[in-house]
Amino acid sequence: MTPTVVPFVKASACGNDFLIIDGMHAPADLEAFSRRICDRHDGVGADGVEWLFPAPDADVRARLFNADGTEAEISGNGTRCVAAHLCAEQAKEKITVRTGAGIKTCTLTSRSEMQFEFETAMGEPQVGDEFSVKLAFREVRGVPVSMGNPHYVVYVNEFAPGWQAEAAEIGRHHDFKYGINVELVVIKDRNNIEVRFFERGVGETRASGTGSGASAVASIATKQAESPVRVHTPGGIQTVRWENEVFLRGPARLICRGEFFL
């Protein structure tokens, strides 16, 4: 018997990796399938799946499912990976992607074979007042920022060993009913910050587009930095401009094509 296969493209933006799949191949249970294919031992392995569907008002509609199967509003890096895929397929320099957080426009700034760089118009952020969260052993203060998805930005002097456990505790704190993405930020100077990410539905990631945006916006809002901000992550550098709207600039690389057996 010939197995049923689901074609995919794998892409990465600063080490934040995604599987891109045409919605025509979508199974009935997107949550379970996304969890299965993202598994790094028994699946292909990725931080999430971008499912692509037709859109009347954009080049494509992208539904993002995290590695744990939960659906999220948007990934800045995932959106850039989708743009790279469409750019390679259609030879376009401007890609519009309808996400759960609205339409995002990705403008190609450079390309070398399957390596792309885009600047993405991410929309206007919402910045809240800094507040504290009580954890099991201490209290932390952070700045809430919405980039179309929720973030809590915490400033630290250094990334202490085991920071992931504390970030996970923040992310599931009862103050955040639906969970939250957590960023730990070290200010390097007025235009450079270093960030670690713990994403809702994924865990630690090497980079995050919306997380980079949230970290830069929070740093500017609290007068610790000024636009543009270079965000240094374990996966590379992204640049954030905040001019009412946030503009996120960074790379995306198409890694491979493949087929996943059902």
Please describe what each predicted stretch is.
Residues 1-114, 153-262:
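A glycine-rich beta-to-alpha transition motif near the start of alpha/beta enzyme domains, typified by
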Residues 114-122:
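Short, solvent-exposed secondary-structure boundary/capping segments
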Residues 126-128, 133-138, 143-147, 246-262:
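C-terminal domain-closing interface element
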Residues 149-151:
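Internal alpha/beta core interface subdomains
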